[in-house]
């Protein structure tokens, strides 16, 4: 739904290298993970969205890197969240963050538990 800058797309040589390492044709959509050993796994979901310390190289459908907005969406950030930092910093923010919907769910359960505890004291 957004215009992806050409800088996010892999070169033809890099795409061919990754496709030649695959044993089967991956599903679409998929997130490709390349680990430090060069093993490439293709999954219909992202199992690792890590900060800069990770070697994992995430690629959408074997064609391009995730945009800053896409990484933050995976963590539950709303599209209204303003991104005014470089790509490398956005990757760290997304990789080190806690999923927003998870925090909301936990906070809601904590509030319920506190309400129940307070109503029992009366």
Question: Residue spans of the language-model regions?
Answer:
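S-adenosyl-L-methionine-dependent DNA methyltransferase catalytic core
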Residues: 1-122
